[in-house]
Amino acid sequence: MSVFGKLFGAGGGKAGKGGPTPQEAIQRLRDTEEMLSKKQEFLEKKIEQELTAAKKHGTKNKRAALQALKRKKRYEKQLAQIDGTLSTIEFQREALENANTNTEVLKNMGYAAKAMKAAHDNMDIDKVDELMQDIADQQELAEEISTAISKPVGFGEEFDEDELMAELEELEQEELDKNLLEISGPETVPLPNVPSVALPSKPAKKKEEEDDDMKELENWAGSM
């Protein structure tokens, strides 16, 4: 079977339904490359053999040497043809692989686009705006509740702030005065001089009058 017959099918058989897949075509091209590479190795060996035969016969058997060189030329021609065919097949395989890669990429991108569209089917910009507004309202409400909970409660104890501030200022002033007094020390007050002579005692007459008054008081108390 020829190379192209193996590649495209022989005998005009029916192609598979829908044609071959890119993976199948790529695999066939690789198989063909492998077959041609083996053919190359075979021809290279034949060329080497014919060259050896031509050298062996040399001038001893000129006719055999010429025949060996002719076969060598035919093998070299076939080898050159196979080299060209391999280059073409490699180019085709690479192009098909790139096309298959692009197809897979586009297929996956389309699949992702459909998934994204399905995710957005039940969603529009108005609903998104409404949802974000609801979230903002709930956050604001949560902050108000947190503020209300954390605010101290007097439980009926109401005080005049101005009165409390005045009392606090008074206490601060007292503390300041006390500190200043401690820094400056107590003020020294001069004491009177001690008299150098004895003080006169009470007059005797005045003492007698006081004794009479005491007796009179005692008599009055005893008569009752």
Swiss-Prot record:
Coiled coil (UniProt feature): 23-183
Subcellular location as annotated: Cytoplasm, Cytosol; Late endosome membrane; Midbody; Nucleus envelope
One GO process term, biological-process aspect: viral budding from plasma membrane
Chain positions found as N6-acetyllysine: 6, 114
PTM field: ISGylated. Isgylation weakens its interaction with VPS4A.
Modified residue annotations for N-acetylserine: 2
Region span, Disordered: 1-23, 185-224
Ranges for region Intramolecular interaction with C-terminus: 2-153
Keyword Transmembrane helix: no
UniProt-annotated stretches for the region Intramolecular interaction with N-terminus: 154-224
Biased composition (Gly residues): 8-19
Pfam families found in the cross-reference section: Snf7
Membrane topology (UniProt): Peripheral membrane protein
GO cellular component: amphisome membrane; autophagosome membrane; cytosol; endosome membrane; ESCRT III complex; kinetochore; kinetochore microtubule; lysosomal membrane
Superkingdom per UniProt: Eukaryota
Modified residues (Phosphoserine): 184, 223
Keyword vocabulary terms for this entry: Acetylation, Coiled coil, Cytoplasm, Endosome, Membrane, Nucleus, Phosphoprotein, Protein transport, Transport, Ubl conjugation
Cited InterPro entries: Snf7_fam
Domain notes: The acidic C-terminus and the basic N-termminus are thought to render the protein in a closed, soluble and inactive conformation through an autoinhibitory intramolecular interaction. The open and active conformation, which enables membrane binding and oligomerization, is achieved by interaction with other cellular binding partners, probably including other ESCRT components.
Family indicated by similarity: Belongs to the SNF7 family.
Assembly description: Probable core component of the endosomal sorting required for transport complex III (ESCRT-III). ESCRT-III components are thought to multimerize to form a flat lattice on the perimeter membrane of the endosome. Several assembly forms of ESCRT-III may exist that interact and act sequentially. Interacts with CHMP6 and CHMP4C. Interacts with PDCD6IP; the interaction is direct. Interacts with VPS4A; the interaction is direct. Interacts with VPS4B; the interaction is direct. Interacts with CHMP7. Interacts with CFTR; the interaction requires misfolded CFTR. Interacts with PTPN23.
Function per UniProt: Probable core component of the endosomal sorting required for transport complex III (ESCRT-III) which is involved in multivesicular bodies (MVBs) formation and sorting of endosomal cargo proteins into MVBs. MVBs contain intraluminal vesicles (ILVs) that are generated by invagination and scission from the limiting membrane of the endosome and mostly are delivered to lysosomes enabling degradation of membrane proteins, such as stimulated growth factor receptors, lysosomal enzymes and lipids. The MVB pathway appears to require the sequential function of ESCRT-O, -I,-II and -III complexes.
Annotated protein name in UniProt: Charged multivesicular body protein 4b
Gene designation: Chmp4b
